[in-house]
């Protein structure tokens, strides 16, 4: 009688979506992609989609209630039901589930959690104040997984792990001792680490070199944006800090501003405000949810901002807003990219720098932004290949600079779920 098939599920819980991938054990074969979208939306219904690799199962896509009507904790069980109903996979056969958790503090490896031994979840929930839009929801997802799959082992994998190689002089904040009881030190931690790790692997494979020889600057640009300086495959600096708020502006995040600005902007900035079932300051709500592209352009959709750069496509007011927003975004991005390229160039010759990578939704789709960034880097020998840059094809890794360009430009698709699965494979030894 053949051995019973077992599975690994990688789950990536965001504030507006859940993504996942299902792998066979021990072959590590990718079987299916999972997605839940429109979470928390008052205007659109939640969509649950299961897409199987050819011959592995029956694809399915269904709509549920409106996003703001569905409890977040119920979404993972709903997703599991759709998964098991679309093929022969049984819930009892899902042996491991790995979860993306944004903030892991100083942890340099994942944490295992099983039903009845959930101490790690308590620790992670304490860090929710530092990543209020992500950590708490990830904890809810893990708890719902433990209830739906009581036999399995969950592995919590943190975006902050990749940045544990950052030196003290880079991560230290010049603050006096705190009079608060802190759940972790106040310092730079950095985020998007699972994405950066997957990009290093993909670029190394494309260049046919070991990951520990990759020297690159990455711009992960999406609803949340950050940049990272990577030397010998390891993070040496990154734009996000104690929380994802520091650094580049995002869809609704302000990015780095003078810390006193919020107290002039809002009189009761330090007062409490509720986010679901926990409390943060009003300042954190304004800076995390009401700022960024939304504040400057009135939209979080970067594609709409690009469209409104054409004055014939919108009102004069929207055109002026789009021009300023785009200029601000480009300026802040160049500040970090140039800084990180300088860091690399101060230690390795330009011939040993693998280039500048664009990733994330904006990075992968924003041909105009990529061109404008690379043109500003012409002094380093960057030469844009217009045809490659404007093309929508090219695979996981695509070069967008000319053959003789001294500084290479790349578009690399990120694969957080795939990297999580790799980490789980190493952790569990299958």
Swiss-Prot record:
Substrate binds at residue 100. It is an enzyme of class 2 (transferase). Pathway: Metabolic intermediate biosynthesis; acetyl-CoA biosynthesis; acetyl-CoA from acetate: step 1/2. ATP binds at residues 19, 220-224. Gene3D superfamilies: 3.30.420.40. Disulfide bonds: none annotated. One of its GO terms (molecular function) is magnesium ion binding. It holds the Pfam family Acetate_kinase. The record marks 192, 253 as: Transition state stabilizer. Its cofactor is Mg(2+). InterPro entries: Ac/propionate_kinase, Aliphatic_acid_kin_short-chain, Aliphatic_acid_kinase_CS, ATPase_NBD. It catalyses: acetate + ATP = acetyl phosphate + ADP. Its EC number is 2.7.2.1. Keywords: ATP-binding, Kinase, Magnesium, Metal-binding, Nucleotide-binding, Transferase. NCBIfam families: ackA. Belongs to the acetokinase family. This is Probable acetate kinase. It comes from Cryptococcus neoformans var. neoformans serotype D (strain JEC21 / ATCC MYA-565) (Filobasidiella neoformans).
């Amino acid at each position: 009688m053949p051995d019973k098939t077992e599975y690994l599920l990688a789950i990536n819980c965001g504030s507006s979506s859940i993504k996942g991938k299902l792998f066979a054990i021990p072959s590590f074969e990718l079987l299916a992609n999972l997605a839940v979208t429109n979470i928390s939306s008052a205007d659109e219904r939640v969509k649950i989609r299961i897409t199987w690799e050819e011959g592995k199962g029956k694809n399915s896509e269904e709509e549920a209630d409106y996003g703001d009507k569905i409890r977040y904790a119920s979404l993972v069980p709903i997703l599991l039901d759709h998964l098991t109903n679309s093929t022969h996979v049984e819930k009892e056969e899902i042996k491991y589930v790995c979860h993306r958790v944004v903030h892991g503090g100083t942890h340099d490896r994942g944490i295992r959690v099983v039903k009845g031994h959930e101490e790690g979840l308590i620790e992670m929930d304490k860090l929710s104040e530092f990543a209020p839009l992500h950590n708490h929801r990830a904890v809810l997802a893990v708890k719902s997984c433990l209830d739906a799959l009581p036999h399995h082992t969950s592995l919590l994998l943190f975006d902050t792990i990749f940045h544990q190689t950052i030196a003290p002089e880079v991560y230290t904040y010049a603050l006096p001792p705190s009079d608060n009881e802190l759940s972790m030190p106040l310092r730079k931690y950095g985020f998007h680490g699972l994405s950066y790790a997957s990009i290093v692997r993909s670029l190394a494979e494309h260049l046919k070199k070991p990951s520990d020889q990759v020297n690159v600057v990455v711009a992960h640009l999406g609803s949340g944006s950050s940049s990272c300086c990577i030397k010998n495959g390891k993070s040496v600096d990154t734009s996000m800090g104690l929380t994802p708020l520091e650094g580049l502006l995002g869809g609704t995040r302000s990015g780095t501003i003078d810390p006193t600005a919020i107290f002039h902007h809002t009189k009761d900035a330090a007062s409490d405000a509720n986010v679901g079932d926990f409390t943060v300051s009003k300042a954190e709500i304004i800076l995390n949810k009401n700022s960024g592209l939304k504040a400057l352009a009135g939209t979080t959709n970067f594609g709409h901002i690009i469209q409104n750069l054409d004055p014939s496509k919108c009102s004069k007011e929207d055109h002026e807003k789009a021009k300023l927003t785009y200029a601000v975004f480009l300026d802040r991005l160049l500040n970090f990219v140039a800084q990180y390229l300088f860091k690399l160039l101060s230690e390795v010759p330009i011939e040993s720098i693998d280039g500048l990578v664009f990733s994330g939704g904006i990075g992968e789709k924003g041909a105009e932004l990529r061109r404008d960034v690379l043109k500003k880097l012409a002094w380093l020998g960057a030469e844009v290949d217009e045809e490659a840059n404007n093309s929508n094809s090219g695979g996981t890794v695509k070069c967008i600079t000319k053959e003789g360009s001294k500084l290479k430009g790349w578009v690399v698709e990120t694969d957080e779920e795939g990297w999580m699965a790799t980490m789980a494979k190493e952790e569990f030894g299958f």
